[in-house]
Amino acid sequence: MAAISINVSTVKPLGDRVFVKVSASEEKTAGGILLPDTAKEKPQIGEIVTVGPGKRNDDGSRSEPEVKVGDKVLYSKYAGTDIKLGGEDYVLLSEKDILAVVD
């Protein structure tokens, strides 16, 4: 199977989905011990790269997304689909899986 090259800027989420660049996980503990990849926890914070057009309502109209590109968000630990593009980690989430916008 051939590898497909996808540019992050071409990803357009559908509906109420958002595409989030995952923040890097901690490399070492507070005590200075380096963590191997298998011991690192999955980050739950990231920056929104693209936002879908919004959820479609019963009457056919769309609800405006509550988040925007550039927002730093906290999301559910097991939410979304993990995607790796260009050596970077991303997650495709439904807007309902976002718990908070972080300042």
From Swiss-Prot:
Database matches in InterPro entries: Chaperonin_GroES (IPR020818), Chaperonin_GroES_sf (IPR037124), Chaprnonin_Cpn10_CS (IPR018369), GroES-like_sf (IPR011032)
PROSITE patterns registered for this protein in UniProt: CHAPERONINS_CPN10 (PS00681)
Disulfide bond positions: none
Keywords: Chaperone, Cytoplasm
Database matches in Pfam families: Cpn10 (PF00166)
Subunit structure: Heptamer of 7 subunits arranged in a ring. Interacts with the chaperonin GroEL.
Family indicated by similarity: Belongs to the GroES chaperonin family.
Protein task: Together with the chaperonin GroEL, plays an essential role in assisting protein folding. The GroEL-GroES system forms a nano-cage that allows encapsulation of the non-native substrate proteins and provides a physical environment optimized to promote and accelerate protein folding. GroES binds to the apical surface of the GroEL ring, thereby capping the opening of the GroEL channel.
Protein name: Co-chaperonin GroES
Native source organism of the sequence: Rippkaea orientalis (strain PCC 8801 / RF-1) (Cyanothece sp. (strain PCC 8801))
